[in-house]
Swiss-Prot record:
Residues 1-21 form the signal peptide. Coiled coil: none annotated. CDD domains: Chemokine_CXC. One of its GO terms (biological process) is defense response. This is Stromal cell-derived factor 1. It is found in: Secreted. Heparin binds at residues 41-51, 62, 69, 85. Residues 29-33 are annotated as: Receptor and heparin binding. The lineage of its organism: Eukaryota, Metazoa, Chordata, Craniata, Vertebrata. The record marks 45, 48, 64 as: Important for integrin interaction and activation. InterPro entries: Chemokine_b/g/d, Chemokine_IL8-like_dom, CXC_Chemokine_domain, Interleukin_8-like_sf. SMART domains: SCY. Chemoattractant. Activates the C-X-C chemokine receptor cxcr4 to induce a rapid and transient rise in the level of intracellular calcium ions, and chemotaxis. Signaling with cxcr4 mediates the directional movement of mesodermal cells during gastrulation. Binds to the allosteric site (site 2) of integrins and activates them in a cxcr4-independent manner. Keywords: Chemotaxis, Cytokine, Developmental protein, Disulfide bond, Gastrulation, Growth factor, Secreted, Signal.
Length: 93
C-alpha cells in the first residue's frame, strides 16, 4: 500500500469513528412538535410526562379508541389540574 492510500484510509476510518451514535438532528429533536388542545380526558388511556434538557414539558397521551399517541398542550386547564394533583400526591408520599 502506498502512503497516499494509507493516509486516505486513515482519514476515512477516523471519520467513521467520529460519526458513531445518533445524528445531530435526532439528538436535539423533541418528541412533540405539534400539540392537541381539544382532546377530552375521557378519550385518554394513559399519559406520559417527558422532560428533557433540550425540550420543554412534553405530555404524550395514548388514545383509548385507536391506541394512537398524540402530544397534548401542557397549558390546557385539565392537564394543569392533573399535574398539580399528581405532584401533590408525590409530595405527600
Amino acid at each position: 500500500m502506498d502512503i497516499r492510500t494509507l493516509a486516505l484510509f486513515s482519514i476515512l476510518l477516523g471519520s467513521l469513528c467520529l460519526s458513531e451514535g445518533k445524528p445531530v438532528s435526532l439528538v436535539y429533536r423533541c418528541p412533540c412538535r405539534y400539540f392537541e388542545s381539544n382532546v377530552p380526558k375521557s378519550n385518554i388511556k394513559h399519559l406520559k410526562i417527558l422532560s428533557t434538557s433540550n425540550c420543554s414539558l412534553q405530555i404524550v397521551a395514548r388514545l383509548k379508541h385507536n391506541g394512537k399517541q398524540i402530544c397534548l398542550d401542557p397549558k390546557t386547564k385539565w392537564i394543569q389540574e392533573y399535574l398539580e394533583k399528581a405532584l401533590n400526591k408525590k409530595v405527600k408520599t
